[in-house]
């Protein structure tokens, strides 16, 4: 299990570095003489048609609705596996990450709502600063190489998984468009079929994937965001605790490199391309961008640290092994890297073609960048302090 976690962390860390470069490339293209080619590429119409069924969207929406459904399929499987046998499988292990994640969702959302209170047209973006980009956060953490204890990385992984679960619930409950009854009934029936396959202990992946593809179409047409289909399918894929070869492990192993090295970087490339034309530095200090920056950089670490401190003092949870408060504070700042998940929620809140979405991306990019830089500095200083204390302790015993 430890080797599995280490491989996962290495893959996510590498993905975070690739994400950074694809986001920078998108920003360069969006503000270069090739900007028209970049935006035209994202606007290419793509059509899927079978009989009377017709799905016609620009490439950008296929990325956000289609490729991200595969990403959320992986998220669903990760949540299920961690709940059965990983870092969320017992209250002792899951206690602090769950509590910290809840605080890290409530406080930034509350701060955003307070700042944006005078601009109700932007209130739909309240969930934007709730998210943590696990790939980016682990990418920054990897820059500290072996100086950070594994328990701190596992804590970040568990917290981010709970964050993802919270994001899934928010998307399902608050970012659903007008519902269409017949496709929704089909989606319910197909979800029930997946449950029956699981209960019948069907161990072949093919039936799940066929029903899952139909479920994606039904959910897409129902008005509920299509990524929810990926989560439902992920929960349905069978897994046996302690078994080394299960359908869930097989599919997770196959999808993880695609998600880390293609889906998330491609999503970042498609959505991070913000044109700075007409924008000024003063825009960062007002309205929507400011609310997002404050939510990510101040609200996120404040929420994580405050509830963690209260939980530990009340003896409801304990700090991870070999982790001190300084390290946890640095990690909590790192949790403010919202990036891909925040951009995704921003697109749902405002629509990808709106000025509000462009403004939200400005706040997300700068808020995530500030969180990454300060989180890295704080963690580096905290690990140096811990190393000096350990050296003094060892030398005093000699």
UniProtKB/Swiss-Prot annotation:
Role according to the record: Na(+)/H(+) antiporter that extrudes sodium in exchange for external protons.
BP term (GO), one: regulation of pH
GO (cellular component) term, any one: plasma membrane
Source taxonomy: Bacteria, Pseudomonadati, Pseudomonadota, Gammaproteobacteria, Aeromonadales
Major subcellular location class: membrane
Localization, UniProt: Cell inner membrane
Membrane topology annotation: Multi-pass membrane protein
Entry's transmembrane regions: 8-28, 59-79, 96-116, 124-144, 154-174, 177-197, 202-222, 223-243, 261-281, 292-312, 328-348, 362-382
Protein name (database record): Na(+)/H(+) antiporter NhaA
GO terms of molecular function: sodium:proton antiporter activity
Gene3D superfamilies membership: Na+/H+ antiporter like domain
PANTHER family: NA(+)_H(+) ANTIPORTER NHAA, SODIUM ION/PROTON ANTIPORTER NHAA-RELATED
Catalyses which reaction(s): Na(+)(in) + 2 H(+)(out) = Na(+)(out) + 2 H(+)(in)
Pfam families: Na_H_antiport_1
Family according to the record: Belongs to the NhaA Na(+)/H(+) (TC 2.A.33) antiporter family.
Keywords: Antiport, Cell inner membrane, Cell membrane, Ion transport, Membrane, Sodium, Sodium transport, Transmembrane, Transmembrane helix, Transport
């Amino acid at each position: 299990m430890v080797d599995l976690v280490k491989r996962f962390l290495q893959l996510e860390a590498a993905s975070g570095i690739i994400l950074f470069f694809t986001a920078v490339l998108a920003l360069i293209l969006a503000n270069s003489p090739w900007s028209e080619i970049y935006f035209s590429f994202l606007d290419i119409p793509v059509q899927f048609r079978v009989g009377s069924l017709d799905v016609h969207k620009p490439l950008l929406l296929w990325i956000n609705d289609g490729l991200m459904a595969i990403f959320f399929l992986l998220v669903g499987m990760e949540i299920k596996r961690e709940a059965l046998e990983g870092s969320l499988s017992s209250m002792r292990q899951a206690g602090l990450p769950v509590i910290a994640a809840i605080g890290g969702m409530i406080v930034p959302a509350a701060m955003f709502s307070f700042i944006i209170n005078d601009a109700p047209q932007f209130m739909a973006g309240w969930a934007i600063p709730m998210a943590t980009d696990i790939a980016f956060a682990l990418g920054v953490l990897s820059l500290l190489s072996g100086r950070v204890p594994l328990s701190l990385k596992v804590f970040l992984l568990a917290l981010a998984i709970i964050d993802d679960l919270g994001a899934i619930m928010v998307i399902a409950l608050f970012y659903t468009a007008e519902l269409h009854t017949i496709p929704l009934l089909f989606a319910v029936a197909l979800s029930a079929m997946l449950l029956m396959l699981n209960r019948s202990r069907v161990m072949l992946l093919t039936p799940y994937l066929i029903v899952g593809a139909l479920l994606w179409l039904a959910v897409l047409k129902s008005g509920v965001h299509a990524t929810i289909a990926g989560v439902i399918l992920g929960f349905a894929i069978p897994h046996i605790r302690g078994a080394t070869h299960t359908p869930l492990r097989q599919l997770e192993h196959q999808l993880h490199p695609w998600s880390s090295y293609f889906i998330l970087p491609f999503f970042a490339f498609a959505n991070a391309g913000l044109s700075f034309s007409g924008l000024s530095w003063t825009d960062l200090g007002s309205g929507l961008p400011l609310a997002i920056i404050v939510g990510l950089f101040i609200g996120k670490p404040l929420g994580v640290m405050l509830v963690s401190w209260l939980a530990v003092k009340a003896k409801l949870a304990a700090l991870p092994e070999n982790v001190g408060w300084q390290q946890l504070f640095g990690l909590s700042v790192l949790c403010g890297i919202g990036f891909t998940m925040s951009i995704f929620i921003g697109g749902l809140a405002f629509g990808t073609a709106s000025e509000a979405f462009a403004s939200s991306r400005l706040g997300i990019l700068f808020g995530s960048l500030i969180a990454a830089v300060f989180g890295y500095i704080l963690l580096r200083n905290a690990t140096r302090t811990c190393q000096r204390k350990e050296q003094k302790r060892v030398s005093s015993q000699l």
